[in-house]
């Protein structure tokens, strides 16, 4: 996984690029009708229900736009919210509040939706030892925000990107000439380049799982698109030789059944690619 320093840098880049994209050479709507000296106050109003996420990110946005803005937080990230709740108040230059408004809302609406969906999966897994993982099926440019939201919702982050963990999937295996060749080439590459990266290998059937185990040195086996019966067989075959992960179209109706098969992790792209934004507003008070 990436370090905190790397993650913080990603957040800084997201904010800078989003403000560049949205503000350009100036918020001319505000500049045209609001004096530089005008002060204002606004509230973040919840118009939905679920798990709130992105409050700490909003603070960073306000600070980036204008370090003199003050935020009074009433509700923390990860809290359950309902219609009518006020998450925070922000106070400062009216122009600055308006400049930050859309980025704050866009981010918080999506992050809250992801956190809410993640919490549904987490609750469905309660009582098992299985953790829910996100994937790289994220919105380009804001992956750090979406993975942050998964953690706020109680989920666990998978690898951040292609560079912080090795995952040998079906195409890697086929292009390499088979499971054993892919794994052995990977081990040689890591040794040659002096890299310490964990290896995950996708298995499409029980025979490939045995091939992976025979090679050894794998951190986790991805049991992809298996039915329940074969998943249980795979878990029994793997035992404590490495960790296990189920994936492949797993949803709210099936996630508990896969957890009951004994896997350590379940990954779901739906946490980030299939959500409906939470309805939030930033209103002047």
Regions found by a protein language model. Name each.
Residues 2-204, 208-215, 220, 229-237, ...:
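Acidic/glycine-rich phosphate/pyrophosphate-binding loops and surrounding catalytic core
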Residues 281-285:
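Active-site loop ensemble at the mouth of alpha/beta enzyme cores that anchors a bound cofactor
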Residues 203, 248-253:
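Small/polar glycine-rich anion-binding or flexible loop at a beta-alpha turn
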Residues 223-224, 244-250, 268-270:
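Glycine-rich beta-strand-to-loop/alpha-helix junction loops that act as flexible
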């Amino acid at each position: 996984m990436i370090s905190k320093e790397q993650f913080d840098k990603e957040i800084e880049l997201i904010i800078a690029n989003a403000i560049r994209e949205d503000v350009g050479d100036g918020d001319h709507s505000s500049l045209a009708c609001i004096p530089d000296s005008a002060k204002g106050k606004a509230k973040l109003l919840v118009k939905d229900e679920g798990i709130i996420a992105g409050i700490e990110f909003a603070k960073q946005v306000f600070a980036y736009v204008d370090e003199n803005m003050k935020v009074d937080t009433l509700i923390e990230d990860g809290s359950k919210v309902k219609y009518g709740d006020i998450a925070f108040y922000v106070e400062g230059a009216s122009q600055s509040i308006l400049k930050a408004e859309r980025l704050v809302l866009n981010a918080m609406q999506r992050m809250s939706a992801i956190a809410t969906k993640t919490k549904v999966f987490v609750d469905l897994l309660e009582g098992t030892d299985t953790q829910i993982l996100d994937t790289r099926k994220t919105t380009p440019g804001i992956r750090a925000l979406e993975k942050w939201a998964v953690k706020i919702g109680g989920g666990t982050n998978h690898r951040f990107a292609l560079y912080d963990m090795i995952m040998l999937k079906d195409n890697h295996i086929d292009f390499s000439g088979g499971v054993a060749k892919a794994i052995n080439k990977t081990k040689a590459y890591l040794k040659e380049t002096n890299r310490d990266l964990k290896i995950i290998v996708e298995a499409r059937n029980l025979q490939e799982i045995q091939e992976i185990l025979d090679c050894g040195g794998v951190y986790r086996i991805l049991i992809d698109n298996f039915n329940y019966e074969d998943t249980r067989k795979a878990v029994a075959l793997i035992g404590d030789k490495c960790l296990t992960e189920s994936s492949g179209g797993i949803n709210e109706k099936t996630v508990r059944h896969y957890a009951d098969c004994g896997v350590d992790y379940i990954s779901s792209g739906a946490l980030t690619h299939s959500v409906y934004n939470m309805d939030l507003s930033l209103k002047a008070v």
